[in-house]
Amino acid sequence: LDITAVNLKVFKHLIDNWTFHSNIVLPNEKHDAPNTDWVRLSLSLDNGKQITLAPEGFRKHEYRGTFFIEVFTLLTKGSKICSDQVNFAVDLFESKHFQSPEIMFTNSSVSFREDERYFSALARLEFNHYLTK
């Protein structure tokens, strides 16, 4: 499984289509929360399983994963911009099906919270990744 290819495909789709003025933070990137809006991205994949019987080189494997998009907006801006950004991100992937690598988004959920500095929204986008080997 080449998780790098999955990461690149998913992250690139969001970054290429993002229309808001928020800093985007990738996994394992050192980051101090700025005094501005920002978005944190992360992705996880399970170990997967073989889903077809076939000779070697033609066996299809399925991996399930979750893409996390966490949006932070300053309290002084109100909660609407946070909601708009996370909903835009979810809409970018709703029922999306990529080829090479094959990735199909299947489900999403969003939760909101606030702390002393930010409104934040966490989108969990579930997907299946298929690989033939």
Question: What is each PLM-predicted segment?
Answer:
Residues R59-L75, F119-Y130:
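Oligomerization/assembly interface segments of phage tail-like spikes and tubes
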